[in-house]
Structures are given as structure tokens and as C-alpha cells.
């Protein structure tokens, strides 16, 4: 049976209409691509170097495109997480997270451990703790969680004692200071540069690495034990998103033997993988 001209025209109209409908559909490919993208907030370039390897592993093993967003301080990454400008962040200790999460009314959730970095006391002018002069200046971070940690380190090193009844102590809570050290409080990211005008400084490891401080020449190293388990670093997500499969896959991509290997290559003894660490 032959096909009439009318049938040909009708078939053409239907085909064109079908194409038009298809063209107006959402781009499923790009939508799927967006769903496989995770933006992770970091602080400092030293962490970025390790996450570049994690990024490759996540792409290879899970098809995830990790975007890295760098911050220069410890305040903005949690705000960015709450504001939804990033999906995860990986920069803070458990103790710092607990303090910040109260400020953000419980909107943050820990989704996995990363590493622990024993912080150290550094000096450009002295080789041992005993060399620190009476009345000398020691720099510590000024945000509550990191200042408490710095005071713990100074106390463990035998330089001061402070009132442990205070939940978030500052230099004002020091109760014993036999060498009359002047404790100077500065922003965490300024502690390393403050060494130029101070006798010593307690510097967070990521900032110490960024400043190219020699960790092997530190005057004192914070002990890694159960008492300091709150200083393990974590990956955080927004509350309500923590069970997303893709976020769990990012954590899995981080917590691998490959990451341990790269961590050792990049940082030596400065960082210790913490997801399977056994503290005594």
C-alpha cells in the first residue's frame, strides 16, 4: 500500500514536534554531572596537596568530581558550609568543631576522621625550652579551642600551669608562670609570622607547614594520646546531608592506605592518619 502525501506531512510534523519536546527537556547529563560534584572547603595549601590525591582517587573509584575551595582562616569554612556555598569541609579538630557547632546551633555534623597533627612549640632564636629567657614572649592562637590546646601544650612542656576549671581558658587563666613569660594572643594564621618578634610560638601544624617551619627543630611536640583525642581532625557536613551516599564515598576515598602513603610523603611525622589510630 502506498503512502499518501498527507501521511508524509503528518509524520514529519510529529517527528519535528518530538524533537522539540526532547530539546526542551532538562539536560540529564549535566544534572547527573552536578550530582557527582562535591565542593570541599580546606584551610591552607598544605591540606590542598593531600586532597589533590584524594580527588584523583574519588574520580577513579567513584566517578566523583571533588572541587577544592581554600580558606585562609578557621572561621569562614563552617560559615560557608552552613550557607551551602560548600558541601563538606576538612580543616578542624573535634574540639574546635564542638565549640563552633554550638555557635551554629547544631547545624554541622562530623562524617569522618582524617588525621591528627601534634602541634609544636617553635622558636627562631632558641634551641631548647630551657633557653627561653625569663620574661620572654610566647605567642599562642587566640581562638578559644586552639588557645586551650596551646595552653595544654605549654603546661605539658612545664612552662606554665592554668586553671582547668575554666572550660575555654585564655592567658588570663594562667595560675603559675615561674619565668614570667608574656603570653601574646594572635590569630592562628599569624602565629608563625609572629616568631620574628617573639621568643617562641605555639603554631598549628597546617600553618607551620605553609610557613615552611622545620618541625624536626621544634622545642616541644604535643603528645598523641587519649587525653588529646579531641585534637583529631574531621570531615564535616551540614546536618541533614550527612547520609548522602556521595559524601560517604568522599570519606572512603580519603580513608585509604594510598592517602596514608601520600600523607607520609608530604608531611613526614607532622600528620598521622587518625581514622584507624589506637590511642593509649
Task: State each model region's role.
Residues 118-129, 231-244:
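A bilobed periplasmic-binding-protein/Venus flytrap-type ligand-binding module shared by bacterial periplasmic
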Residues 44-67, 76, 80:
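Short, polar/charged alpha-helical segment
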Residues 34-45, 64-70, 137-138:
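Short, well-ordered beta-strand elements
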Residues 146-155, 253-275:
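Periplasmic-binding protein-like
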Residues 99-111, 125-126, 202, 210-223:
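Ligand-binding "clamshell"
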Residues 57, 75-87, 152-153, 172-203, ...:
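Short helices/loops that flank or line small-molecule/ion binding pockets
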Residues 111-160, 260:
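A conserved helix-loop-strand patch within extracytoplasmic ligand-binding domains
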Residues 1-28:
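Sec-dependent N-terminal signal peptides of Gram-positive bacterial secreted proteins and lipoproteins
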Amino acid at each position: 500500500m502506498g503512502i499518501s502525501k498527507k501521511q508524509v506531512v503528518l509524520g514529519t510534523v510529529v517527528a519535528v514536534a518530538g524533537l522539540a519536546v526532547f530539546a526542551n527537556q532538562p539536560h540529564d547529563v549535566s544534572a547527573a554531572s552536578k550530582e557527582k560534584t562535591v565542593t570541599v572547603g580546606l584551610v591552607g595549601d598544605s591540606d590542598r596537596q593531600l586532597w589533590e590525591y584524594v580527588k584523583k582517587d574519588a574520580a577513579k573509584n567513584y566517578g566523583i568530581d571533588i572541587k577544592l575551595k581554600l580558606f585562609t582562616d578557621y572561621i569562614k569554612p563552617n560559615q560557608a558550609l552552613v550557607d551551602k556555598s560548600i558541601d563538606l569541609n576538612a580543616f578542624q579538630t573535634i574540639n574546635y568543631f564542638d565549640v563552633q557547632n554550638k555557635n551554629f546551633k547544631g547545624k554541622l555534623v562530623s562524617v569522618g576522621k582524617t588525621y591528627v597533627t601534634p602541634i609544636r612549640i617553635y622558636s627562631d632564636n632558641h634551641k631548647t625550652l630551657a633557653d627561653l629567657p625569663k620574661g620572654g614572649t610566647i605567642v599562642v592562637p587566640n581562638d578559644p579551642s586552639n588557645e586551650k590546646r596551646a595552653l595544654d601544650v605549654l603546661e605539658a612542656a612545664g612552662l606554665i600551669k592554668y586553671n582547668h576549671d575554666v572550660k575555654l581558658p585564655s592567658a588570663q587563666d594562667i595560675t603559675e608562670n615561674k619565668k614570667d613569660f608574656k603570653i601574646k594572643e594572635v590569630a592562628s594564621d599569624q602565629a608563625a609570622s609572629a616568631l620574628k618578634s617573639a621568643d617562641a610560638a605555639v603554631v598549628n601544624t597546617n600553618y607551620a607547614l605553609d610557613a615552611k617551619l622545620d618541625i624536626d627543630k621544634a622545642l616541644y611536640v604535643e603528645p598523641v594520646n587519649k587525653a588529646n583525642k579531641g585534637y583529631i581532625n574531621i570531615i564535616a557536613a551540614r546536618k541533614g546531608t550527612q547520609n548522602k551516599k556521595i559524601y560517604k564515598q568522599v570519606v572512603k576515598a580519603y580513608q585509604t592506605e594510598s592517602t596514608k602513603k601520600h600523607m607520609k610523603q608530604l608531611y613526614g611525622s607532622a600528620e598521622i592518619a587518625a581514622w584507624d589510630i589506637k590511642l593509649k
